[in-house]
Amino acid sequence: PINIKNENNLPSISIKNSDIEFKDVSFKYLNTKDKAINKINLKIQGRSMTAFVGHSGAGKSTIINLLPRFYDPQNGKIFIDDQDIKNINLNSLRKNISLVSQDIILFDDTIRANIAYANDSATDKEVVKACEFAAADEFIKKLPNGYETMIGENGIRLSGGQKQRISIARAILKHSPIILLDEATSSLDAESEKIVQNAITNLTKDKTTLVIAHRLSTIHNADKIFVVKDGLIINSG
């Protein structure tokens, strides 16, 4: 992501329904010829799940990454509850959005510290509760030092499924009304996949959720589906 400056004098975002709208949004990465997304128009109803499907490089991740302003579009505007996100304090915007990605960033610290990073005022009890909802508590308790277990640089001592559950626990602890979910394509075994899916169901309940979907079960559960191809939305339903 490029360095978007936070303007401290801008107002905090006011979330009511967490409706999202993209109006004529186009974006091109530096040193690339083609636009990653081109004149995207979409409306997402608050507290619903919207799935984006399409081949790799179609523009799905770009759409997701524009919402917390990891990048700003060259054209068009993005609104949350009718507020242009460029006119909102950046810290306030990002506090209201949780990203659960396959590229989770973990620190060489304890499991507890890695989860509490999402909400520095959270109590130990709240951390444990978030882990229970994320189906992470069970495996954490089996570790040599439980929540005080050091996980190594970027969580090297954890499996893919365990990392994902840590990421989900973090998002649950953050209590944000908007969830961005980039489903892991890495193959989890059937049991881990079921556990992760249940954790995601707990996380996304009553939240506005945008998901880059790779699993049929997610697509079935979505309230709306957008098909993305070559930076365009070619179908929805």
Please place each PLM-identified region on the residue numbering.
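Pre-NBD coupling/linker segments of ABC/ABC-like ATPases
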Residues: 2-15
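ABC-type nucleotide-binding domain
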Residues: 13-237
